[in-house]
């Protein structure tokens, strides 16, 4: 297994797919990285030379990925909660942030149903 940005990427897959195992790199960005590094995206990782892997690593370093990206996202959410914006309040309450209805749905965000005593038979 090759290592790119401290992440083990699978050898048996194509380079463009293997790069998507890194948090913050999707298919489009993976294709762009490989194009900038002059590497064929259909080539399997196991058949890449050490020089090609080095070029890929150098290109991938230019982007915010993994721990830095997670930290940035968490800081953005924390900032929203501190300034008490609508989105920050929704994050704090554990409700959907992007305007979805919550009367019947939103179970993923709200968690399992909490039964209330005395509500039965209404």
Curated annotation (Swiss-Prot):
GO terms (molecular function) for this protein are: rRNA binding; structural constituent of ribosome; tRNA binding
Q: Does the keyword Phosphoprotein apply?
A: no
Q: Where is this region: Disordered?
A: 94-122
| GO CC term (a single one) | cytosol
Q: Where is the composition biased (Basic residues)?
A: 106-122
Alphabetical UniProt keywords: Ribonucleoprotein, Ribosomal protein, RNA-binding, rRNA-binding, tRNA-binding
Range of residues in the leader sequence: none
Which InterPro entries does the UniProt record give? Rbsml_uS13_C, Ribosomal_uS13, Ribosomal_uS13-like_H2TH, Ribosomal_uS13_bac-type, Ribosomal_uS13_CS
Q: How does it assemble?
A: Part of the 30S ribosomal subunit. Forms a loose heterodimer with protein S19. Forms two bridges to the 50S subunit in the 70S ribosome.
| PANTHER family, sorted | 30S RIBOSOMAL PROTEIN S13/40S RIBOSOMAL PROTEIN S18, SMALL RIBOSOMAL SUBUNIT PROTEIN US13M
Name of the protein: Small ribosomal subunit protein uS13
């Amino acid at each position: 297994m090759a290592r790119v940005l401290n992440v083990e990427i699978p050898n048996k897959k194509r380079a463009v797919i293997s790069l998507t195992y890194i948090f913050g790199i999707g298919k489009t960005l993976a294709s762009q990285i490989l194009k900038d590094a002059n590497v064929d995206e259909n080539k399997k990782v196991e058949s890449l030379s050490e020089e090609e892997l080095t070029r890929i690593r150098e290109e991938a370093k230019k982007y915010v990925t993994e721990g830095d990206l997670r930290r940035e996202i968490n800081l953005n959410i924390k900032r929203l909660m501190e300034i008490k914006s609508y989105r920050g309040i929704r994050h704090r309450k554990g409700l959907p942030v992007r305007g979805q209805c919550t009367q019947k749905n939103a179970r993923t965000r709200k968690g399992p149903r909490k039964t209330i005593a005395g509500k039965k038979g209404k």
